[in-house]
Structures are given as structure tokens and as C-alpha cells.
């Protein structure tokens, strides 16, 4: 992505110079580790600021009062590590759960270098989700269909945690499928990075209808 586009993303987010420098460091780390760990689609590295950074930053605007975040299947730290970097000055803390040990190595090293308030957990989601009660927001990007996301996050969504799940053009079909099993209170927020994408914001979840 060109420098003017980088500047546009940073200006729109309204981040400080120090935060911009930390995001630059994250991008440098992503490019350095990509050939070894295959963290993101190779073609997206040329659009890293719009495809990844801005896509993550928009979640902060949807929960401006949230301080504790849980990112599931963190992978390359999108959105979780980016949220930690950008939210650092407002007191945000993010837990990153990732089952791939190699990706956890990237997350741990990059969190250290950027001084991001993030804790990396090398574990399977279903094994640890119960430990994160009271979290303000749980999020996951490009991880699983809505039915599976709701199954994993049920203990949190039923007790006041908000869910933010970026989705693509098939979001309505995913919600229809999930609706056969769950009573979900949600709204769809248009993505500012993709006209066909939506962010599913879940504010309440009831038990599956067959229980």
C-alpha cells in the first residue's frame, strides 16, 4: 500500500505518533515473518494497511468503552494484536488465543517489540473459553461460520460480553443457519474496508432452541 494510503488510514483512526510507529513496527514484523510462517495471504501484503490494519481498527469504533478484549484464532494478530496496539493509550487489554505454536511465536515477539498490552495463549478455544468471563468484547476474523463462533463463545455472550465478528458476502446465510439453533440479538454493521462485508455485532444470545 502506498504511503498516502497509510497516512489516510492513520488519520481516519486518529492515532498518536507513538501508536503509528508501533503499527509500522507491526507491519514490518508481519513482512519479515511472512515468508517463514505464512501468516496472511501473500497477495494482501501489498494492501496491508487497508486489508488488515484498517479492517481491524474499525472494531475499536464499535466498542469505544470496552477495555478488555478476547481475540479467538488470532493468527497474525488480526484483529487482536492491532487492537492492542491502537487501544494501548486508552487502557485496552487484549487476550490472544491461538492453537498454532508457530503463530504464537510471532504474536509473542511482536507484542513485546510493540509494547502492546496483549497476552498470548497457545491453546484450543474450547479448552480455555470459560476462563474469560467478564470480558467486554470477544472477536474473531476469518475463523469459522457463525454457528461455530456462537458455540465457542456461548459462555461469554450469555453473560454480557459483546461479540464482534467480521464477515463476508455470505453473512446472511451464516446467520440464517445459526438462527436454526440460537436466538441471537445482533445487528449488521457495514465494513468500511469492503462494500460487501459486514461486522456482526452480537449483544445477546439465548440457548439453542432444541435444548
Swiss-Prot record:
Q: Name one GO molecular function term.
A: rRNA (guanine-N7-)-methyltransferase activity
Binding positions for S-adenosyl-L-methionine per the UniProt entry:
73, 125-126, 141
Q: Keyword check for S-adenosyl-L-methionine, yes or no.
A: yes
Top-rank taxon of the source lineage equals Bacteria
Principal cellular location given in the protein's record: cytoplasm
Which Pfam families does this one have?
GidB (PF02527)
Q: Which EC class is the enzyme in? A: transferase
UniProt cross-references to InterPro entries, sorted A to Z: rRNA_ssu_MeTfrase_G, SAM-dependent_MTases_sf
Q: Which residues cross the membrane?
A: none
Reaction equation(s) it catalyzes: guanosine(527) in 16S rRNA + S-adenosyl-L-methionine = N(7)-methylguanosine(527) in 16S rRNA + S-adenosyl-L-homocysteine
Q: What is its EC number?
A: 2.1.1.170
Task: Please give the GO cellular component terms listed in this UniProt entry.
Answer: cytosol
Keywords, in A-Z order? Cytoplasm, Methyltransferase, rRNA processing, S-adenosyl-L-methionine, Transferase
Matching entries from NCBIfam families are given as: rsmG_gidB
Annotated function: Specifically methylates the N7 position of guanine in position 527 of 16S rRNA.
PANTHER family, per database record: S-ADENOSYL-L-METHIONINE-DEPENDENT METHYLTRANSFERASES SUPERFAMILY PROTEIN
Which family is this sequence assigned to? Belongs to the methyltransferase superfamily. RNA methyltransferase RsmG family.
Q: What is this protein called?
A: Ribosomal RNA small subunit methyltransferase G
The protein's organism comes out as Methylobacterium radiotolerans (strain ATCC 27329 / DSM 1819 / JCM 2831 / NBRC 15690 / NCIMB 10815 / 0-1)
Amino acid at each position: 500500500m502506498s504511503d498516502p494510503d497509510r497516512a489516510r488510514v492513520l488519520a481516519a483512526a486518529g492515532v498518536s505518533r507513538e501508536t503509528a510507529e508501533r503499527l509500522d513496527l507491526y507491519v514490518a514484523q508481519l513482512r519479515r515473518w511472512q515468508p517463514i510462517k505464512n501468516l496472511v495471504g501473500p497477495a494482501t501484503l501489498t494492501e496491508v494497511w487497508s486489508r488488515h490494519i484498517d479492517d481491524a481498527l474499525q472494531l475499536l469504533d464499535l466498542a469505544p468503552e470496552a477495555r478488555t478484549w478476547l481475540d479467538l484464532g488470532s493468527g497474525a494478530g488480526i484483529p487482536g494484536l492491532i487492537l492492542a496496539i491502537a487501544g494501548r493509550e486508552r487502557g485496552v487489554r487484549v487476550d490472544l488465543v491461538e492453537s498454532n505454536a508457530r503463530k504464537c511465536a510471532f504474536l509473542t515477539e511482536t507484542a513485546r517489540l510493540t509494547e502492546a498490552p496483549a497476552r498470548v495463549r497457545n491453546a484450543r478455544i474450547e479448552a480455555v473459553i470459560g476462563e474469560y468471563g467478564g470480558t467486554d468484547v470477544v472477536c474473531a476474523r476469518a475463523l469459522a461460520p457463525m454457528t461455530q463462533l456462537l458455540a465457542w463463545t456461548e459462555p461469554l455472550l450469555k453473560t454480557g460480553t459483546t461479540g464482534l465478528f467480521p464477515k463476508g458476502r455470505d453473512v446472511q446465510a451464516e446467520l440464517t443457519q445459526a438462527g436454526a439453533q440460537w436466538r441471537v440479538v445482533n445487528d449488521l454493521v457495514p465494513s468500511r474496508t469492503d462494500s460487501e462485508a459486514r461486522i456482526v455485532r452480537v449483544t445477546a444470545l439465548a440457548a439453542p432452541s432444541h435444548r
